[in-house]
Amino acid sequence: MITIVLMLPTAVYVHLRLPGIRRLMEGITILPIVIPPVVLIVGVLQIAPGPLKGTPYLLALEYVVLAMPFAYRAIDAGLRSLDLKTIVEASNSLGAGWARTLLRVLLPNLRTAVLAAVVLTVALVLGEYTMASLALYQTFPVWIYVNSQTSGQVSVAASLLALLVTWIFLMGITVLGTRQSRRTGGGSVTLFTVARQETRGN
């Protein structure tokens, strides 16, 4: 969730205000994939404030950095499919501010992209072992590995459960994406809703 909250406004702002640095942003966001997890966790431990060390919040921060490339690219792909500038200008002309435009206009149109980013992040966390083991936290992948040493059946069942949950999420995104593609004028409907609410407010 933290990854989505950070990446969605960032991607929208880059597309609207700073289109010239889109390639630079793509290069920056891909760094967590290039840098080995061991180097990443050691670097985070070096720069992290003292109160965060040894807490689950530090591991959450590391997962945010690790999931950033996948979340940003999923949202970026969704933004490329929209006439973003026209939608935002139309929303602003109806009196909607930046926050309202983002939450009430852009987010519904980016529902499939955001869900894809969520699923990719969840799948990454469910399969990430190195960071959690080095940080001495028993996350789901670490628990599976530890139990595989004593009970192979339990670890296999847990792995299948993780695959099943990920598959269900992916199927849900596919269904939502299919429904959204069949609709026409989805952005116009959202803008009409904003206009109607503004009219009522006046």
Give the ranges of each region predicted by the language model.
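Short functional hotspots where side chains directly engage DNA or cofactors
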Residues: 102, 146, 159
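Ca2+-coordinating acidic residues in Ca2+-binding motifs
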Residues: 89, 139, 159
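Short glycine/proline-centered loop/turn elements that form peptide/ligand docking sites
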Residues: 82-87
